[in-house]
From Swiss-Prot:
Co-factor binding details: Binds 1 [4Fe-4S] cluster.
Location of the region described as Disordered in the Swiss-Prot/TrEMBL record: 1-98
Cellular component, GO, one term: nucleus
EC number(s) reported in the record: 3.1.-.-, 3.6.4.12
Keywords recorded for this protein, A-Z: 4Fe-4S, ATP-binding, Chromosome, DNA damage, DNA repair, DNA replication, DNA-binding, Helicase, Hydrolase, Iron, Iron-sulfur, Metal-binding, Multifunctional enzyme, Nuclease, Nucleotide-binding, Nucleus
Organism whose genome encodes this protein: Arabidopsis thaliana (Mouse-ear cress)
Compartments, record wording: Nucleus; Chromosome
Biased composition, class Low complexity, residue ranges: 40-52
Residues annotated as domain UvrD-like helicase ATP-binding: 924-1271
Cofactor names: [4Fe-4S] cluster
Name listed for the protein in its UniProt record: DNA replication ATP-dependent helicase/nuclease JHS1
Residue window of motif Nuclear localization signal: 2-8
Keyword presence, Protein transport: no
């Protein structure tokens, strides 16, 4: 196996020694040692455990600083470790394609080491990495001017930080007469240099603080708004005979180690105070005077259990305005006692020290009454809906203002409403995507659609709605099949409901002749006459980051409300439709809560105060008015905050809310299996579950090994999911985003209205197509020539070079107002435009119909890839299926790693499938043996297909052999292109198949085999078709199609399995009794964004896990038909240990055919010489050094060289379609694209080229330095990617780079030596290139 760098120890990285992440063997031995090595190591590595390195291990520190090259099995090439002073530049690189992150000692903060505690209790505390360190520095960058604080303004040292107790609030007795205290001042100690190391997120969400029953508090509820059904914790009142005390905490109380690392966190804030400073000169004329907050000054500040008392100090006057659109970073949390405006006597309250992340201004927030119980910790993000006074203070209590915790976590209104019953169930709903299809839910959805259609029509009729109902049933025929219901029964149910729907529309739609219908809005407002004057939108997508909420509103309506005084008011309201009867009890509360939360969403979306909503129950034909009361909002927002906290705790610590412990409810819960398994994995038992034998039945079949596997992979999924949260934050709250271009979204897009808007009508639905183009560049930029951009490395961003692809789901958001408008699917994308398909017309909430087109075309748009809600929830669902009771077979293979079984006796039998394989002349011996391995497998088989060895052809013949046996087959891969490539070859063989997937994502050659193209009109037709077809194909994440709910297969074949993460691979395997994994784990591994997840094993595919555990299950394809001999020798020497061989003499001797050998340049003539199959163009004599375009790396000289070679190839008769260009960096790919704008050559990064090949491949390595240093940790040291780059060419491989720089990478040094053996190195001179 190719060499890997020797692992380095650090305060952040554990020293992993597990089967998932063991060291590789030297590349010179390569794949021939595969079987022996895994047989020797499988037992020992499978039992190893992860150990965490001591953050101050001196040995590790010395090891990091060492510059000695060590020759070990882990480091066979003697890779030198970098010295700290030499690696600074390398560490600052932000490579776009590399998953590698360089680690060295210089980037560690002193705060990561153990420090002596500052409190009087003695002992030591361990400094954790601060969750706010990086964000503080990011906030500092947004401050217009760096500002200095003098010693006079910062002279008081910060109070000693004390963790508050989870179990009780400690009171301290002090004399009261004549004593008044002021608000405690939080001023930092003398600043130190801020850490330069980016901080990883730590556990920033802790358990909720509950007062101990031992505390002498009187529980009171003095709500002035009346009783609310949404109960919140009561406030606490301090007895008058007890004096107030202060409890200051730097973290949430009661958390594991919170008191220690949160105190260290606060000390770290002191280090960065010189960055976050306030300059009086810059703020004299920008101050804003706000209404005074009701902060009482009769508070005595004291520190619990501490002999040091702090003197009363006042916060400085605010000199900077607080941006109302900013989020606040919580720096410190203190608990005190005092008098609030809504409470009598002394009561506890919290004070949050905040930092405005947009302006860098500090302020204070006071939480009273129910808000006192809010779980807030240093490092959390919050939003405050309210005003701060001139001193930067704000109160949140029963009567005033709101606190939104974790506003970037957008929680669905339906989730908040449902969480009152069981928070644990709601969190599981959020984290797991279930395959369940319920008839009741489906009928409700269909009735929703029919009712919404009636609302949208000007004159709805029974016949019209019945016709629409039939169309809706036809669209949902797959779901009907999954639920097992007949379309005739569903049609009958919908037809019966239509008269009631029309009756409601007739009574409540506004017209001069219609009768007045009154709606009861409750005791506060009473009955009001209501008429709907306009249906503004249906299924309106609404996100409100201000409140941390999102939702899809059934109908947004404009309503005319007539009062008793004959006055008329026009309002906008949400209309929520329920298909059942008006309930009572918990369900009624949930429905009301849902409508109330929708009023918040609409208030934010329409910039209006919306405080009423309508709730219509179809079966009971009852309409309720919902009037929003502050007491309800307080309870719901607190519940939303708790739920957001629960979701974040689950994603950071894998801890769920406690079980409900109610057998009557839990027995019927959809998550009973998952809930009990998680509880057991978290250390729970029968008694703590509260379910008795029911609990034991669901977990007794699992062992400690199983629970360890579950916890490990559950954590890895969450680590990877956290990386996606960064992009989610940009969608939810993009104010701080400065970049104009990102790989996962497009910015500065404008709607192209030159040809109007397109409509795509099918027999099932109408889609609206909107075409977007990049906003025109500025005039000055347009004058810059293409040559100028290439020479300077300065790129235009008009090209749509990103990760978005046809068929991807996307979110449309306005760039200026940051309004999320719609979601859709990419119908088409090119370098110049992107077309998005929507299910309804695109509209802006404030836009009038007459000006709709004009408003849309003048808006700037961002288009985000919507990849957050599906993949990770599917991964967790797949993972949990290994541990349910009926998952025994797949669990023993994947978790227990039991050896697979093979029926070798059948090879000699008269099986017609085996006879076919022996008789098929187009198969070589390797391919034949691989198919025989598949046919004899009882559990699973593994096919290791090296580059160009005909994996796809082998699978085609394997499918034909299995069909001869009468087997049913499920084909799957991670990408749509990989699935379609196989299906195209099956189609050429006349094999019938069913392709599951969206039309937009499927290749046009196989689109006719999609279910949507088959015009299935009945459940019976689906059953017949699925019984008839033997081959079904889907992506791994699309496997949850309703068509597969009741389907089982004999064999599942997964292509490109080496690139698929283990939890993703599990999904298709659940549908089959035997499976086949086809791949090559010596090429690209699964793409993992999180460094921590990758280091802990998430980059290890199921293919690799099983092949390392059981080499006997592998059948190797090593006869390749792609590369000529010279190119193949490179990969053999570096990766495969001479196991690859050419499949024929024609392949081995193939050369690039040129129509003419004439060339104006001698160096180009040498490069194009057909007998030179491998060429390395050395740029060391050209001073062709790398450049930086912001954080991206490119090389303008290499781009020019590539352009000249491509031009010469085309001039000499090589078709541009036979030429491919590969580079490790996106920025270089864009630069080369500008260098050859008129030549249609495929230019991609290495990751995008796996599975593709060309006659001639050019590789631009980019990296070139005047004084090169070791680059072992860079992208170029990733041997998987280098392997892919070298094995894409058929007849000629041309590499361009700096020999001096690349030689510092051990793997590339071997490559260059091998090229030198072939006399393939060509040194360019300064006069060789065109001027």
């Amino acid at each position: 196996m190719p060499p890997r760098k020797k692992p380095k120890s650090s305060a952040l990285k554990s020293n992993k020694q597990s089967s998932a992440n063991h060291s590789s063997q030297p590349s010179t031995f390569g794949i021939q040692q595969l079987f022996l090595r895994h047989i020797q190591n499988s037992q020992s590595t499978s039992n190893s455990h992860t150990s965490t390195a001591d953050p101050v291990d001196q040995q590790n520190v010395n090891g990091l600083a060492s510059d000695t090259a060590v020759l070990t099995p882990q480091n066979p090439l003697g890779t030198s470790n970098e010295k700290p002073d030499e690696s600074k530049d390398m560490d600052q690189q932000l490579t776009e394609a590399s998953p590698k992150i360089s680690k060295n000692l210089k980037r560690f903060s002193p705060g990561m080491l153990i420090k002596q505690s500052q409190d009087d209790c003695g002992g030591e505390i361990t400094w954790k990495i601060s969750p706010v360190n990086e964000r503080l520095r990011a906030a500092a960058k947004n401050i217009p001017k760096m500002m200095d604080l003098t010693e006079n303004s910062l002279g008081v040292k910060s109070s000693t930080i004390r963790p508050c107790s989870l179990n009780k609030l400690v009171q301290k007795q002090c004399p009261t007469s004549g004593i008044t205290s002021k608000v405690e001042q939080w001023l930092s100690s003398p600043s130190k240099k801020a850490s330069k190391r980016p901080a990883f997120a730590t556990n920033r969400v802790m358990e909720r603080v509950n007062p101990s029953p031992d505390a002498e508090f009187e529980i009171v509820n003095t709500s002035s708004s009346g009783n609310s059904p949404f109960q919140t914790p009561p406030s606490l009142s301090c007895p008058h005979n007890k004096l107030p005390c202060t409890v200051t905490c730097s973290g949430a109380c009661g958390s594991m180690g919170a008191g220690q690392h949160k105190k260290a966190l606060l000390e770290l804030l002191d280090q960065v105070e010189d960055v976050i400073a306030v300059d009086d000169k810059t703020t004299d004329d920008v101050g804003i005077v706000m209404p005074q907050a009701r902060v009482k000054d009769d508070i005595i500040s004291s520190v619990v259990d501490c002999a040091v008392d702090e003197g009363p100090v006042s916060l400085p006057k605010m000199q900077n305005s607080i941006n109302p659109d900013s989020y606040f970073l919580v720096l410190e949390v203190s608990e005190k006692r005092g008098s609030g405006s809504s409470s009598k006597g002394q009561c506890p309250y919290k004070v949050l020290r905040l930092l405005d992340e947009h302006t860098g201004v500090e302020c204070a927030l006071y939480l009273w009454d129910e808000w006192f119980y809010s779980t807030v910790s240093p490092g959390d993000s919050i939003n405050v809906i309210g005003e701060f006074d001139g001193d930067g203070k704000c109160d949140v209590d029963r009567q005033n203002n709101f606190l939104i915790v974790h506003p970037d976590t957008l929680v669905a209104g339906t989730r908040v409403a449902a969480s009152f019953g069981c928070p644990r169930r709601t969190v599981l709903d959020e984290r797991l995507r279930s395959n369940e299809h319920a008839t009741v839910a489906l009928l409700g959805t269909l009735q929703h659609q029919v009712f919404q259609a009636g609302l949208s029509q000007e004159s709805p009729s029974v016949d019209g709605l019945q016709e629409y109902a039939s169309t809706v049933i036809e669209k949902s025929i797959e779901s009907l099949y999954a639920c097992g219901v007949h379309e005739g029964d569903v049609r009958s149910t919908l037809f019966k409901a239509i008269p009631k729907m029309l009756n409601w529309i007739e009574h409540f739609r506004y017209s001069k002749d219609s009768e007045v219908s009154k709606v009861d809005f409750g005791s506060t407002i009473g009955k009001k006459a209501v008429k709907v004057s306009e249906v503004i939108d249906i299924e309106e997508m609404s996100w409100a980051p201000k409140y941390g909420l999102k939702g899809m509103i059934d109908a947004s309506v404009r309503v005319i409300v007539e009062s008793d005084m004959n006055t008329v008011n026009e309002k906008i309201m949400p209309l929520e439709f329920k298909s059942g009867k008006a309930p009572s009890g918990q369900s009624s509360i949930e429905h009301s809560a849902q409508v109330i939360l929708y009023t918040l969403l609409m208030s934010e979306r329409y910039l209006k105060h919306i405080d009423n909503g309508l709730l219509y129950y179809l079966q009971s034909d009852q309409t309720q008015g919902i009037s929003v009361q502050r007491s309800d909002l307080v309870g719901l927002i607190i519940r939303r905050n708790e739920l957001a906290n629960d979701i974040l705790v689950a994603s950071t610590t894998q801890q769920l809310p406690p079980m409900l412990r109610n057998p009557n409810i839990c027995r019927n819960c959809r998550h009973l299996d998952v809930c009990t398994i998680y509880h057991k994995a978290d250390g729970g038992n029968t008694e703590s579950s509260g379910l008795g034998d029911v609990f034991d039945t669901h977990v007794s079949h699992l062992s400690t090994l199983h629970f360890n596997f579950l916890r490990h992979w559950d954590r890895l999924i969450d680590l990877e999911g956290r990386e996606m949260q960064l992009l989610r934050k940009d969608i939810a709250h993009p104010h701080g985003s400065k970049g104009s271009h990102s790989a996962s979204y497009l910015s500065s897009m404008v709607l192209d209205v030159t040809n109007g808007f397109q409509h795509h009508n099918s027999h099932k639905e109408t889609r609206f197509i909107y075409r977007f183009v990049r906003q025109k560049s500025s005039e000055s930029r347009e004058r810059v020539t293409s040559e100028d951009m290439i020479r300077t490395g300065n790129l235009a961003t008009d090209d749509l070079d990103c990760k978005l692809r046809t068929g991807d789901r996307v979110i449309l958001r306005t760039e200026v107002s940051h309004l999320t408008v719609a979601n859709g699917i990419i119908a088409d994308i090119s370098r110049t435009h992107i077309s998005v398909s929507l299910s309804k017309r695109l509209r802006l909430p404030w836009s009038e119909p007459s000006s709709e087109v004009s408003n849309l075309s003048h808006e700037l748009w961002r288009i985000y890839k919507d990849e957050f809600m599906t993949s990770f929830s599917v991964m967790r669902f797949n993972l949990m299926q290994l541990f349910v009771q009926n998952g025994h077979n797949i669990r023993k293979m994947i978790v227990d790693l039991e050896p697979p079984r093979f029926d070798n006796g059948s090879i000699l039998s008269q099986d017609p499938a085996i006879s076919y394989i022996w008789s098929e002349k187009s198969l070589n011996n390797d391919q034949r043996q691989a198919i025989l391995k598949i046919l004899t497998a009882k559990d699973y088989a593994l096919i290791l297909g090296m580059p160009g060895t005909g994996k796809t052809s082998t699978m085609v013949h394997a499918v034909k052999a299995l069909l001869i046996r009468g087997s049913s087959i499920l084909l799957a891969s991670y990408t749509n292109s990989a699935v379609d490539n196989l299906l195209i070859k099956l189609k050429a063989q006349g094999i019938e198949f069913l392709r599951i997937g969206r039309d937009e994502a499927v290749h046009e050659e196989v689109r006719e085999s999609c279910f949507s193209a088959m015009n299935m009109c009945s459940v019976e037709d689906i059953k017949k078709k699925l019984d008839q077809v033997k081959v079904v194909a889907s992506t791994c994440l699309g496997i949850n199609s309703p068509l597969l709910v009741n389907r089982r297969f004999d064999v599942c074949i997964i292509d490109e399995a080496g690139q698929i993460a283990l939890p993703v691979s599990i999904g298709p395997l659940l549908f089959a009794s035997t499976f086949v994994l086809v791949g090559d784990h010596y090429q690209l591994p699964p793409l993992v964004q999180s460094t921590e997840a990758r280091e802990n094993g998430m980059g290890i595919s199921l293919f690799r896990r099983l092949s390392e555990a059981h080499p006997q299950a592998i059948s190797v394809l090593q006869n390749q038909y792609r590369m000529c001999r010279g190119i193949m020798e490179l990969s053999n020497a570096l990766i495969y240990g001479d196991r690859l061989c050419c499949g024929s003499a024609e392949v081995a001797d193939a050369t690039l055919v040129l129509s003419t050998s004439s060339s104006t340049s001698p160096w180009l003539k040498k490069v194009l010489e057909p007998t030179r199959t491998v060429v390395f163009v050395n740029t060391d004599m050209l001073r062709a050094f790398e450049a930086r375009d912001q954080n991206a790396i490119n090389n303008p000289v290499e781009a020019s060289i590539i352009a000249e070679i491509v031009e010469e190839l085309v001039n000499n008769g090589v078709d541009s379609k036979d030429i491919g260009i590969i580079t490790p960096y996106n920025s270089q790919a864009s630069l080369i694209q500008h260098a050859i704008p008129t030549t249609p050559v495929e230019i991609h990064t290495i990751d995008k080229y796996q599975g593709r090949d060309k006659d001639c491949i050019l590789v631009s390595f980019v990296r070139s330095r005047e004084k090169p240093r070791s680059s072992a940790s860079s992208l170029l040291g990733d041997w998987h990617r280098i392997n892919v780059a070298l094995t894409r060419a058929k007849k000629k491989l041309i590499m361009v780079g700096s020999q001096r720089t690349l030689s510092r990478v051990p793997l590339l040094m071997l490559l260059l030596n091998k090229v030198k053996e072939q006399s393939g190195i060509l040194n360019l001179l300064p006069g060789d290139l065109k001027p």
